[in-house]
From Swiss-Prot:
Substrate binds at Q116. Residues 1-18 form the signal peptide. Gene3D superfamilies: 2.40.128.20. The gene is RBP4. It holds the Pfam family Lipocalin. This is Retinol binding protein 4. It comes from Felis catus (Cat). Retinol-binding protein that mediates retinol transport in blood plasma. Delivers retinol from the liver stores to the peripheral tissues. Transfers the bound all-trans retinol to STRA6, that then facilitates retinol transport across the cell membrane.
Amino acid sequence: MAWVWALVLLAALGSARAERDCRVSSFRVKENFDKARFSGTWYAMAKKDPEGLFLQDNIVAEFSVDENGQMSATAKGRVRLLNNWDVCADMVGTFTDTEDSAKFKMKYWGVASFLQKGNDDHWIIDTDYDTYAVQYSCRLLNLDGTCADSYSFVFARDPNGLPPDVQKIVRQRQDELCLARQYRLIVHNGYCDGKSEQNIL
C-alpha cells in the first residue's frame, strides 16, 4: 500500500511542476495597464538582483508621463563602491511602448558612469496603482525559454511597506515568475536624504 501513496505523491509533485511554466513567454502581465495612474513616486521594497552594478538600497523611483504619452523614470539609491565607499547615485530610464500596454523596452543609464546601462524589457506584472507594483525584466534567455539573467522589483507607494493582504498577492506573483525566495529586502533608512554633494553622484 505504501507504494500506492508514493505514486500518488510523485504524481502530485509532477503536476505541481507542470503547472509552473517558467518560460518567460508564459508570464502574465497587468491587463490594460494605465501609465498615467502608475505615474508618481514608488519605493522599492524588495529586489531580485541581476548581474552588474545597480542601485542597492534606499531606492526611490519617480515615474512620469509627458503630453505625448511617453513614460520616463528617474531613480535614486545607495551604491557601494570598492567594498567600502557608499554613495547616492541617480539612474534615468525612458520607455518605448509595445503592442502590450504593460510591456515596454526600457533604455536606462546611470548619471555616474560606473552604473550599468542598457536597453531591457520592462514588464509590469501586477499593480493596483495605489499600493503595490511588481516589475520584471529578463535580460538574457536560456535556450529553453527560461531566463538566465533577470531582475525584479516590488514597489510600494508607502515607504513603510505593504499591508499583509498585499504581501500575499506579491508572494504569489513572485512564485508565478519562478523567483520565489530570490528577493532581498530593500532598506529605507534615509541614507540619501539631505546628503552633502560629495556623497551624491
